[in-house]
């Protein structure tokens, strides 16, 4: 089975193109003083490409993953002097694995419905567990430490929190619910995608998160250094993800 990162791009009608173009031009006219030169460049670039109506091939999950890793590597080639080697490795590994959870059948049913619905006709009625949560419980602490000799036990918590919360989703699923969901819709698929036998998920990783996005989890004091590392990983991960999703190869 082929796994996809997002839905096929919608081709706009001429009327829709004209409407979006007018709205973006009005935005520039009314709020030009509020934008940076980079912001204006992006908006004008989007306007100029609205007429590009040729349908693009649907991006596979592997292609999207490779694009984000490449974006991170290009960024560090230019700005790497401002980061430690460990920081760069942490960000690149987060880019590599943050979307693994998209291999789950429910997500694939949304972005690749024809292929999935041939086998699962009721796929649209099943509630999806957010893909970031699944990604973060697919790797163990020991597997993480083997990714780089630079990684320590202390790095696991900020790293896994950045992957788990790379999108802001309500955090209402506990380990038994995730395991049950994965047994039906994820374990087989992630094993196929990664070309390795994923025998179990590591839902105990939830206990290592710096925070849970819900109203009932207990909060414990966290060292400022851990928060700083988490913010660095998540901030750059989101930066590169948004850059690639917008169609750019390089982040500024």
What are the language-model segments listed below?
Residues 3-12, 25, 31-32, 41-57, ...:
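Accessory nucleic-acid engagement/destabilization modules that flank
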């Amino acid at each position: 089975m082929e796994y996809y990162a997002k839905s096929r791009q919608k081709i706009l009608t001429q009327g829709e193109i004209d409407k979006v173009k007018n709205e973006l031009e009005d935005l520039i006219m009314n709020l030009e003083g509020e934008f940076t030169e980079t912001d204006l460049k992006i908006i004008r670039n989007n306007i100029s490409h609205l007429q590009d109506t040729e349908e693009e091939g649907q991006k596979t999950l592997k292609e999207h993953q490779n694009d984000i890793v490449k974006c991170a590597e290009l960024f560090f080639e230019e700005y790497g002097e401002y980061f430690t080697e460990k920081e760069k490795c942490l960000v690149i590994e987060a880019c590599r694995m943050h979307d693994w959870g998209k291999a789950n059948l429910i997500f694939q049913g949304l972005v690749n419905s024809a292929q999935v619905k041939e086998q699962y006709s009721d796929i649209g009625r099943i509630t999806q567990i957010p893909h970031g949560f699944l990604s973060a419980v697919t790797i163990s602490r020991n597997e993480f430490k083997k990714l780089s000799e630079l990684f320590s036990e202390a790095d696991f918590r900020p790293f896994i929190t950045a992957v788990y919360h790379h999108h802001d989703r309500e955090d209402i699923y506990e380990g038994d619910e995730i395991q049950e969901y994965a047994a039906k819709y994820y374990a087989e698929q992630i094993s196929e995608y990664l070309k390795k036998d994923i025998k179990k998920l590591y839902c105990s990783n939830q206990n290592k998160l710096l925070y849970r996005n819900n109203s009932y989890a207990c909060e414990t004091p966290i060292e400022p250094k851990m928060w700083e590392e988490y913010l660095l990983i998540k901030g750059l991960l989101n930066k590169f993800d948004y850059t690639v999703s917008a169609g750019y190869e390089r982040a500024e």
